[in-house]
């Protein structure tokens, strides 16, 4: 029997998911937007981890925020990446291979593992004055 289309996936009888296009699952963790982008055998997980305080709002917190951003990459697990976006949002990313068959269980497991692993880094960013917040546009 042919795989059944379900949203951005083809689902085989054994539950294996085959991405069609570039599917992404979005979720929130501790008030932060997160995303899981799925490709064949891989998943890229990302979180908007915080934002550097604006000078107009909290200028005194900016030096600590930038110091934390400088130190944090050395503390991240292997394969993780920290990005400072042009609007001063901070993004944490992790790309990984999905072992075995890509199923809904494997995707949710990867998402939960990423969210739980984020906690100490979110704590670190918060202590340096970078909250989840909304970016001003």
Kindly give the residue locations of the regions a language model identified.
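Generic alpha-helical secondary structure
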Residues: 2-6, 58, 62, 107
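A short acidic-to-branched-hydrophobic micro-motif
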Residues: 36-56
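Short, highly charged C-terminal tails/helix-capping segments
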Residues: 125-137
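Short, internal acidic amphipathic alpha-helical interface segments
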Residues: 50-91
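A conserved amphipathic terminal alpha-helix motif
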Residues: 110-128
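A short, solvent-exposed beta-edge/loop patch
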Residues: 83-113
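Charge-rich, low-complexity N-terminal segments
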Residues: 1-40, 74-79, 83-85
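Generic recognition of long tandem-repeat/solenoid scaffolds
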Residues: 22-29, 45-47, 92-94
């Amino acid at each position: 029997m042919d795989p059944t289309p379900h949203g951005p996936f083809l689902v085989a009888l054994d539950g294996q998911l085959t991405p069609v296009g570039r599917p992404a699952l979005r979720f929130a963790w501790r008030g932060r937007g997160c995303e899981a982008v799925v490709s064949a055998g891989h998943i890229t997980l990302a979180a908007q981890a915080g934002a550097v305080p604006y000078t107009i709002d909290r200028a005194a917190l900016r030096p600590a925020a930038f110091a934390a951003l400088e130190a944090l990459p050395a503390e991240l697990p292997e394969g993780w990446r920290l990005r400072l976006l042009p609007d001063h949002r901070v993004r944490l990313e992790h790309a990984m291979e999905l072992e075995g068959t890509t199923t809904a269980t494997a995707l949710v497991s990867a998402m939960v593992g990423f969210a739980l692993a984020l906690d100490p880094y979110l704590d670190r960013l918060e202590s340096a004055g970078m909250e989840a917040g909304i970016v001003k546009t």
